[in-house]
């Protein structure tokens, strides 16, 4: 299975490299990339050029920031890469569990969105997700032993 990973980066060369290398450890899922490099001055361009992955690189001038960079990357992906089964939006500093997508592969389904829980370096949950109940009331969800599916 091929997944198009989409992210914006700025001056986090080593974190970006580590994130991409962790994704590369999956055996049954291949990742290609659309990346907005928003004016990095730390050698990110050179590092990305040396990576052994298929990368569409969009260069910004430092004024896109994360939100506009992601918009530009998503619009590019929709126009140039409409044939991918899955798009994955990520941050440039995400530390993926090695092989996690191989484990998640049986859960992939057409027309579904998957959201992974986020943990800090200390292993504590920092974000899982929320489900709106009514009005402004919601219930928080963290990483659980059992999968949670919402309609």
Which residues does each predicted region cover?
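A conserved acidic beta->alpha catalytic loop
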Residues: 37-46
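Short beta-strand-to-loop element that shapes/binds the nucleotide-sugar donor at the catalytic cleft/hinge
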Residues: 115-130
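Short, flexible, basic/aromatic active-site loop/helix in glycosyltransferases
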Residues: 130-151
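Short, acidic, metal-binding catalytic loop of nucleotide-sugar glycosyltransferases
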Residues: 21-31
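N-proximal low-complexity "stem/linker" segments adjacent to membrane-targeting elements
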Residues: 1-22
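Conserved donor-nucleotide/metal-binding helix-loop-beta segment in metal-dependent transferases, i.e.
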Residues: 101-114
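Glycine-rich, basic loop-to-helix element that forms the pyrophosphate-binding segment
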Residues: 60-78
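Short beta-strand-to-loop acidic/aromatic patch adjacent to the donor-nucleotide binding site
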Residues: 84-95
């Amino acid at each position: 299975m091929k997944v198009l990973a989409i992210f914006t980066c700025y001056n986090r060369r080593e974190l970006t490299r580590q994130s991409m290398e962790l994704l590369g450890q999956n055996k049954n899922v291949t990742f290609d990339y659309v990346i907005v490099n928003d004016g990095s001055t730390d050698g990110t361009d050179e590092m990305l050029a040396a990576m052994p992955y298929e990368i569409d690189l969009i260069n910004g001038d430092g004024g896109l920031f994360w939100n506009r960079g992601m918009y530009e990357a998503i619009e590019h992906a929709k126009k140039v890469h409409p044939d991918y089964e899955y798009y994955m939006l990520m941050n440039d500093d995400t530390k993926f569990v090695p092989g996690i997508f191989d484990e998640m592969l049986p859960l992939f389904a057409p027309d579904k969105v998957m959201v992974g829980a986020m943990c800090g370096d200390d292993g504590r949950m920092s974000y899982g997700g929320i489900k709106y109940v009514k009005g402004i009331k919601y219930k928080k969800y963290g990483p659980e032993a059992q999968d949670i599916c919402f309609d």
